[in-house]
Amino acid sequence: MARLKLRKLEEYLQGVDGFEQPKILLEQYPTPPHIAACMAHHMQSQHEDIEGKLVGDLGCGCGMLSIASTLLGAQLTVGFELDGDAVDTFRGNVVEMELPNVDCVRADVLQLIGSKWEKSFDTVLMNPPFGTKHNAGMDMRFLEVALRLANRAVYSLHKTSTRSYIQKKALEWGARGSVVAELRYNIDASYKFHKQKSKDIEVDFWRFEIGTE
């Protein structure tokens, strides 16, 4: 499983069940299988940050990124998710796909600083809330937590418009950030306030290297 090709990985991820009723306050947008596959494949093929590693997934939702890292050979993947419904779906996906070494902890990501999980992971990956509706700055709070939990690297998605700010804050937090790719992130009309069937937003895929103050 550890040497899955990108296309095959995406095929597997298309079988992952998503949110039944997305919750607007938690900004629950699923990570599309194509983007999740590209993220995980890059992490492993370019940096060897998954296979045999301890991987954390913050705000893991129904498990798309956690499952991607497990399929690429993570030694153990632990997802953290506040929403109980999403946790149930995550665990259902894991059972249905018969995946070992992956679990989901129901927890508030923002409460993980100072917990037993600090510096517990080689790699942390996440698709955080962008903080565009009710949670201003939430993605940066997630990033701060991620940098406390990881020993090696953090991978994350952030709106392109915040790039220079993210670069600056990462340095303040003892990490060097680099933009791996610029993406057009398609958000389906999950909520009533979406007038269009789907819309694209410009998003950066970041890699943060720990301990480069």
UniProtKB/Swiss-Prot annotation:
Alphabetical list of SUPFAM superfamilies matching this protein: S-adenosyl-L-methionine-dependent methyltransferases
Cited InterPro entries: DNA_methylase_N6_adenine_CS, rRNA_MeTrfase/Polyamine_Synth, SAM-dependent_MTases_sf, Small_mtfrase_dom
Any one GO CC term of the record: cytoplasm
Principal location listed in the UniProt entry: cytoplasm
E.C. code: 2.1.1.-
Tissue specificity annotation: Enriched in the brain.
Protein name per UniProt: rRNA N(6)-adenosine-methyltransferase Mettl5
Lineage: Eukaryota, Metazoa, Ecdysozoa, Arthropoda, Hexapoda
